[in-house]
């Protein structure tokens, strides 16, 4: 900001100096051409009026220059004010972003310790946060549509497995289900490995509950799905 003020002073100073030089040259030529130097020096009203008439062009230049400088300084001042405001907003957004991200990370980390089947190194909090709040650095902490769609796809993976369960047939192709669940969870930074059916179901149960806990705390949207309430016929 100091650099902008220095630039303003420099422009005004240089412009004023150039205009002063131009005015002095114009005044000198006017005196020469009108032979004003041959007249006696006097300061009565008639003399001053006569001199003003002869140098009226220079006076108009001064008036125009004054108007231009005033306009320029006003416009430049408004620009500096806007830049100051934008810088303040940006700094405030950065501060809010950092605070919100820290709160998210600390809360998610604390909740993760309550779930023994999920390994901490398998959860990327920063990726999860970026998917959930892609515009957070700009001050917008609204939950993204992409994130809500991912949550919806997790539900679809569960329902697809449910569709294979019947009274006669309990086989839901659990390996295919595991691959699909792993793929969709990876989109929000949660990485899990495939494994025996019962162990995977336990891990999946804790993850769904974990996601719900985060969503209930940070997603103020009526459209978010509570995954742990989705019936899973295969458990």
UniProtKB/Swiss-Prot annotation:
Record localization: Cell inner membrane
GO BP annotations listed: defense response to virus
GO annotation, cellular component aspect: plasma membrane
Topology of this chain in the membrane: Multi-pass membrane protein
Record key words, sorted: Antiviral defense, Cell inner membrane, Cell membrane, Membrane, Transmembrane, Transmembrane helix
Keyword Repeat attributed: no
Keyword Chloroplast found: no
Annotated transmembrane regions: 11-31, 64-84
Role, per record: Membrane component of antiviral defense system Retron Ec48, composed of a non-coding RNA (ncRNA), a reverse transcriptase (RT) and this membrane protein. Expression of this retron confers protection against bacteriophages lambda, T2, T4, T5 and T7. At multiplicity of infection (MOI) of 0.02 cultures grow normally when infected with lambda without collapsing, at MOI 2 cultures enter growth stasis. At MOI 3 cell membranes are permeabilized within 15 minutes of infection but do not lyse, suggesting the phage are not able to finish a replication cycle.
Record remark: domains: The N-terminal transmembrane region is required for protection against bacteriophage infection.
Record protein name field: Retron Ec48 transmembrane protein
């Amino acid at each position: 900001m100091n650099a902008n003020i220095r630039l303003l002073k420099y422009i005004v100073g240089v412009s004023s100096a150039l205009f002063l030089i131009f005015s002095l040259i114009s005044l000198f030529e006017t005196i020469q051409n009108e032979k004003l130097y041959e007249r006696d020096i006097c300061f009565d009203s008639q003399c001053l009026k006569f001199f003003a008439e002869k140098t009226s062009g220079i006076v108009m230049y001064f008036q125009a220059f004054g108007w231009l400088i005033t306009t320029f300084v006003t416009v430049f001042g408004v620009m500096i004010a806007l830049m100051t405001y934008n810088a303040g907003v940006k700094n405030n957004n950065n501060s809010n972003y950092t605070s919100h991200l820290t709160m998210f990370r600390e809360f998610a980390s604390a909740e993760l310790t309550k779930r023994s089947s999920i390994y901490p190194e398998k959860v990327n909090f920063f990726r999860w946060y970026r998917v959930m709040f892609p515009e957070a650095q700009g001050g917008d902490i609204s939950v993204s549509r992409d994130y809500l769609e991912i949550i919806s796809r997790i539900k679809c993976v569960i329902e697809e497995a449910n569709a294979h369960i019947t009274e006669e047939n309990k086989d839901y192709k659990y390996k295919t289900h595991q691959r699909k669940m792993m793929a969709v969870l990876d989109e929000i930074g949660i990485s899990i490995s495939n494994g025996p059916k019962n162990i995977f179901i336990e891990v999946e149960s804790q993850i769904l509950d974990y996601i719900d806990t985060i969503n209930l705390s940070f997603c103020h949207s009526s459209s978010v799905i509570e995954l742990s309430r989705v019936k899973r016929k295969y458990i």
